Amino acid sequence: KSFPKFNKNDFGLKKIESEIWNGFIFIRLNKGPQKSVKSLMSPFSEELGSYKIENMVPTDGIWTQKTEVNWKSVRDVDNEGYHVPMAHPSLQDLYGKNYFDEPFVNGTSKTHASFSGKTARNWSVKNYKKLSTPAAHLPDKYKNSWNYFGIFPNAVIAVTPETVQFYQEFPISTKLTLLRGGIYRHKNETRQQRIARYLSNRIDNHTVAEDVQLTIWSNESMNSKSFEGFYLSDLEYGVKSHHDHMRKQIPILKIEKQPDEHLIYKINKEML
């Protein structure tokens, strides 16, 4: 009552763009040229729709972790899987050679990994394979695999027979990155599914720790005074396709010699 008459709508919260897709809520603070998430992810709509993600519920909320590397080091490691046999013994035990990366095309990518038929040596993997119990609504072709769907530039949605999760990374500075994610389970989860989820989480935790170490080594190598650039092998097409997407959006990345910092915005704008 102490305020004079005025239009409250003029002083309300600012509107932002939002979209609900398969239960996930996406927001955009500023308008941009990107497609809707539904359109962007349309190549995988049938597959991801089979998991009924919108009916799943959170497990332990959102987790966060900071790592002292450039965010692009995190993304480069995550965008190729040929390091799995040497760097991730649990994943190698889970699916072995049954692992295939698809490159980024029009803003999305996919990695498919089906369980191997071999007896696992790792305790968590061995018991996970034994107890994995897919939901009744999941088609047979998705019941024995883990699949990862990349969304350019910095997000991944991963599905297993028991869970769906997202993870992403945000640059805090050129030397510090925030990792963030969440895991969701079936609403009417059985005891066996809960145990399988616990085991898959153990496998994931080991993998995350191993990947963090790889990003540290990668970041250290590029900060070395001896670093003079690199060549990508044919096995690193996932990394290359992500770099190609980056260069398209930020063309100044094509320049080999770093320009003066105060000129970066101007040069990049001229190259668009």
Regions found by a protein language model. Give the residues of each.
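Short Fe-S-cluster ligation motifs
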Residues: K1-I27
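C-terminal catalytic domain of Rieske-type non-heme iron oxygenases
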Residues: E19-L272
